[in-house]
Amino acid sequence: MKQFSQQITDKLYYIGTNDRITEQFENMWPLPDGVAYNSYIIKGSKNILLDSVKSTTIEECIRKLDEVLEGEELHYIIVHHMEPDHSSGIPTLLLKYPNCKLIANKRAVKMLESYYGIKEDELILVDDGETLELGDTKLTFYHTPMVHWPESMVSFEEETGTLFSQDIFGAFGTLDGAIYDDEVEFDRYYLEEMSRYYINIVGKYSGQALKALGKLGGLDIKMICPDHGPIWRNNIEKVIQIYTDLANQKTEDGVAIIFGSIYGNTERMAQLIAKGVAEEGLTNIRMHDVAKTPQSYLLADCWRYKGIILISCSYDKALFPPMAFLTNELKHQKMKNNIWGIAGSYSWNGGAIKGLKEFVEGEKLNVLPLMPEVMGAGSEKDFEDLINLGKMMAKAVKEGKVPEAE
């Protein structure tokens, strides 16, 4: 009986690892519940490992691999994706299995050499749509460039209908005992982390993600084995729909209010705007302090909610620096399905509202015509304008369009 690996099908085993040490994925995105690095081994007449793990957890992966191989050789390692959380364990694997061949595509060649000193003549290269017969296993490879690196690809094993999807359909969070979608409370523990993973890591490449989904749409998929998060065997249509909605940036009726405040006056502005939203009957309101909330969660809420209101104080005749950082990140996301509102504050020289206008106009975003700019603590007229901005946003969200400027 296998103690550490987990058998998936007659020939397929899970040998992935959990990382509860790394605090931020890509040193940017918080991991409050850790992350899993999924790796798989097909044990047949030729033994095939599908994706390695991060080097910090490779020994645990090898322990599981040895348990499955029972002294047999490892013949092939498939490199679906070169990001080091999936490839940095390769050198250790090659030290243990020096006769093993790597399978990758042309775009991975320079990366493998620059990261690990592996030369092109040591590789088996596969084209888009090419099928390889590796002993008694047949795999077809599909290139999925920029989902989310240029060399990214997936493979499909037709006999069992298994798609090895690399980062596509991935999610943050460790796998704590159970590894399948129907063995975990997905909506409770993983849905939010799947959304945040997509938005933070893949979102800016949504056009390419939709192309990849289209390319894979004709396959008879019975199971999806991603490189992060649970294995999908019982709700294939559900996860494909979740991913399609994310790639299309399907928004929900709600408003994310993000403020940058130093001494509390701008925060008070945000509270008045929220009051206006609520007075129009919109209940789905999220408010964040841009200086305290990690960018990961700010981007996720901006992607999710139809209405976004940015409120910033001025700082050295410009945007409050954390707000400036957020707007720069938002530019990369290329979000076009939102309705935007902006407001600014200043003490002697402005800059905040100017910076926010440059952002929404430069990105050609749908923005509300009312753009309050408040000096100091504000006046009664300012307070009225802020409440009206909230009301205007709530109406725009419910109607799905920006009102005409009066």
Predicted segments, located by residue:
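Active-site metal-binding motif and surrounding structural segment of the metallo-beta-lactamase
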Residues: 45, 56-103
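Active-site neighborhood of phospho(di)ester-bond hydrolases with catalytic His/Asp-centered motifs
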Residues: 50-52, 74-82, 102-105, 163-166, ...
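Short acidic active-site motifs
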Residues: 89, 293-298
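FMN-binding flavodoxin-like domain, especially the glycine-rich phosphate-binding loop
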Residues: 4, 175, 186-224, 229-230, ...
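Terminal amphipathic helices with adjacent charged low-complexity linkers/tails
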Residues: 228-254
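Conserved beta-strand hairpin/beta-sheet module of binuclear metal-dependent hydrolase folds
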Residues: 5-66, 154-157, 161-165, 266
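Active-site-proximal loop/helix segment associated with metal-binding centers of metalloenzymes
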Residues: 148-152, 168-203, 245-251
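Metallo-beta-lactamase
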Residues: 6-10, 103-152, 205-211
